[in-house]
Amino acid sequence: MKVGARYKGLGSPQDVQEALSQALYIASKDLATAIYLAMALGKPLLLEGAPGVGKTEAAKALSSTLSCELIRLQCYEGIDANTALYEWNFPRQILAMRQANDAKLNIYDPEFLIARPLLQALHLQSEGLLLIDEIDRADHEFEAFLLEFLSDFQITIPERGRIRASQRPFVILTSNRTRDLHEALRRRCVYHWIDYPSPSLEVDIVLSRASNVARATAEAIVAAVGRLRAEPLAKAPGVAETVEWADAATRLKDLGETWPEAFRRSIGVVLKEQDDLSFLEPRMREIIG
């Protein structure tokens, strides 16, 4: 199936790149190609990279581009299949039993079923995007379950029977690579590593998201963030922090601050650990430039 047959208007990597830019997401050619190929091949897309490089935002921008529903499953330590699939609304079931005059009441009717993200994805009747965010935070058991789910796109609820997807969503998984994912899951996906953007690309991102920022300011902020990322920080600043720092510094400059002072006084937008601030304080002027 050609991509355009299902994802109208996205018939090439360039189409993907241009469409994402309309959603204010500046994607590299390599990322746009990975998205295009995952769509063309009907495979999930696995995005790995450091926190803050734009993995989740890529999924959000793509759903906006496709004008489709975004279903997000946020993974965390201890998540299990029941949490991701469904649960029964026990309080409502009990209340219904107390109030029912009909002996034929079925407490396992769909009205008592609380659909969690994966079941919501199975119920899609039109195009959708399933985002499985930070899969590396889940354990290997949940990862194995997820692999099976992505293979069949169906589940069996003992009280309701088998439920199969009538419209498979496009799937994006993200990982911060805090642990290695199982090779079987990787094989099922189109893989792409998102690195921090090049300075020129990051400047374009800042200008697209913060309309009040001048190009010279964006370039200075991006250069400073690049120096920060080269330091052994507890948390390196992501792209979102770059945009916010440029915006914040510009607002202070508009209130009469000098540029060096505006950069310094807004540093809390980009550095959010006291240890990092203390470590860099003696060299802050050098960092800011």
Regions found by a protein language model. Name each.
Residues 1-289:
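C-terminal regulatory/interaction module of P-loop NTP-utilizing enzymes
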